[in-house]
Amino acid sequence: MGDAGSERSKAPSLPPRCPCGFWGSSKTMNLCSKCFADFQKKQPDDDSAPSTSNSQSDLFSEETTSDNNNTSITTPTLSPSQQPLPTELNVTSPSKEECGPCTDTAHVSLITPTKRSCGTDSQSENEASPVKRPRLLENTERSEETSRSKQKSRRRCFQCQTKLELVQQELGSCRCGYVFCMLHRLPEQHDCTFDHMGRGREEAIMKMVKLDRKVGRSCQRIGEGCS
């Protein structure tokens, strides 16, 4: 009986307090339920952190070893016979010094003008301008007229110097200004310089009858003229 009373007289022990201020328990490491749950969440992260770092280092080392193996496999050793020769490159690629004079000569040949002689120029001008020919002929005829000497006596033929009578002088006078006998009075016989054909054409044109066309121009009513 005395022991029971002594136990009852003892005060019950209080549970420990959590750092947050709530009551904890010995099962939860003297922490409340919330703090204990947070502690459990943090614990696996702390445990997995070194493991993940170790796994990453292992993977990196494996990748480096695999890369080294691949490079050792893919890089073949070239024999001296397979290596490219420098002479082949020099043959295929033309140098600028060789191409330079070729282009210069081509430009020079294009730029240099062709020289023409004076004879060819005069021939081309004569062929291109046919209108100038009659003028040249007229100039030559005038020079021939001036070169001919004047007839001293009109009683003799200018060609054969035979004596002419008065009737023969009148019949043998030519438009070129000279007097000829009956044998040389025609223009074809004494190389006449006068243009008889041109003069005949001009005279024919002057003698042509010009018609005055009055049909359709005057408008008169019937009976106006009679009145």
Swiss-Prot record:
Zinc fingers (A20-type) by residue: 12-44
Q: Where are the zinc fingers (AN1-type)?
A: 151-200
What are the protein's GO molecular function terms? DNA binding; zinc ion binding
The entry's Zn(2+) 1-binding residues are C18, C20, C32, C35
| Compositionally biased spans, kind Low complexity | 66-77
Q: Where along the chain is composition biased (Basic and acidic residues)?
A: 135-148
Q: Name one Pfam family in it.
A: zf-A20
Where are the annotated segments for Disordered? Answer: 41-100, 113-148
Q: Which UniProt keywords apply?
A: Metal-binding, Zinc, Zinc-finger
Q: Which InterPro entries match?
A: AN1-like_Znf (IPR035896), AN1_A20_ZnFinger (IPR050652), Znf_A20 (IPR002653), Znf_AN1 (IPR000058)
| PANTHER family linked | AN1-TYPE ZINC FINGER PROTEIN, AN1-TYPE ZINC FINGER PROTEIN 3
Q: What is this protein called?
A: AN1-type zinc finger protein 3
Native species: Homo sapiens (Human)
